[in-house]
Amino acid sequence: MGKNTVAIDKNELEELKKAAHDLAEENAQLRQKLDHMNELLLNAQRARFGQSSERTKHVMQGGTQLGLFNEAEAEQDHKAVEPTENTIVIPEHTRKAKRTVDELTANLPVKEVLITLSDDELICGKCGGKYEMIGKKLVSRRLEVIPRQCYVVEYYSCSYACKSCETKTGYANIVTTVTPPMLMKHSLASASTVANVMTQKYVDGLPLARQEKIWEREGIRLSRATMSNWVIQCAQTWLKPLYRRMKKALLECSVIHADETVVQVLKEDGKAAVSESRMWVYANNDRSGKPIRYFEYQPDRSGKHAAAFLKGFSGCLVTDGYAGYNLVDGVIRCGCWSHMRRYWREAMPKGATKETSKAAWGYDYCNKLFALEKKFSKMSDVIRKTARQVEAEPLLEAYWWWLETLDPAPGSKLADAVTYAKNQKKFLNAFLEHGEVDISNNFAENAIRPFVQGRKAWLFCDTPKGADSSAIVYSIVETAKANGLDPYTYLKLLLTELPYLGKNPASDKLDLFMPWTAAIHKNCILPTKKISPEDL
């Protein structure tokens, strides 16, 4: 049986070819639109349910519902082994040694409790002689907690008279002792109390309203308004001079990281209570040896505030892609590869691989760059610059060439990533010429994270002065943490000693209280020490 054939003239053939081409083009557009809609749905799911961490182990695993449960439930492991000196836990196929008891309690005092025999038990049951202690053996360790104790200290000024002068002249020479300076006149506030309030709010994220309830349970009627006054007055009077000195030290650094976040201030002139203000943060990197984390409150997000703060600074400024930083003159702008990687991550569909997703290619390029930076991290600035030009520069050349081959759908997350990369190319490449610069803005982002977490608890500031005071205290405690200090101990020391310097202390006096000085480290990092039973 022969094949049936249909005769088609040339015009009909061209029309069919054109129709097939149009259908293929329409199909491609619809597939692109479908991919875009799936991308929007995936990002909505991520925003609502997903893991916010950017650690690479959470990415490219195909899941979207990460971190759905509360921390206690998500982290609970009924088979978890209590840490000991020799314990090594093996989750799945990886081995990671857990911290030992000694490491977990390294900064705690130790009380030794000897379980001894009573007088009756000291009598030997065989011969009637007396047992003598010949040794001791550690059987167990337990972590104990002593609730805080409050008491009132009354300071009395003592007067002394010279009886010899009185005998000779009839008038006694009288001297009177000087009591320690007060934080505030006619107030119960002490350095320890105010430091405790500040630490609980700005380090532990405990709002003053909750602190008020804690004081009530301890039998003390201390209102949140009183605590607020303590924080504001002590920050403005005693901590602000050191805060300003920290700014001067920061501007002398060669690299500054900058970022900002929202803060709501209820009673701000000319603005509605629901309007947004800004908390700016500036930080140097750890290569300086003197870590500084500086917060500054401003009524809005205008780049003029960054320009004013950084006036006179001529080093490298590491930021995200916010255009407001373009107003800062005289600096070398450096971009953030963490932001770049985040754009690729957000553009990756579920289950993305390099074979199925162009965004996964961009994400992989970024991961390779970060892997190189990890290898370079211990190098000096000069050697790191050379290493980057040898190993990182070829990687970036390939990255930028690959980027030019992309033609993403308008409005897609992939298009956002490509646009960000092209707009930031100059800034993203700047680190190649500056070995002292890190490739991400993580120093500023990590510094501002405690503020963002605390904001979830206390929600807003009442007044601009309160917001400014919060900026001062956050600067002090975050800089203390960056320098390895205990924030409470450092605050207590500052509030004890700074009043002796008066309200306008000299710069050289303030330098003695910077958190990286040897004396401050000695007093504000708690050493491990042994305490005998007789001492407690």
Residue ranges and their predicted role:
Residues 1-185, 257-258, 319, 398, ...:
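Short, flexible loop/hinge motifs at secondary-structure junctions
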Residues 2-3, 121-123, 132, 159-161, ...:
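Catalytic center-proximal scaffold of phosphoryl-transfer enzymes
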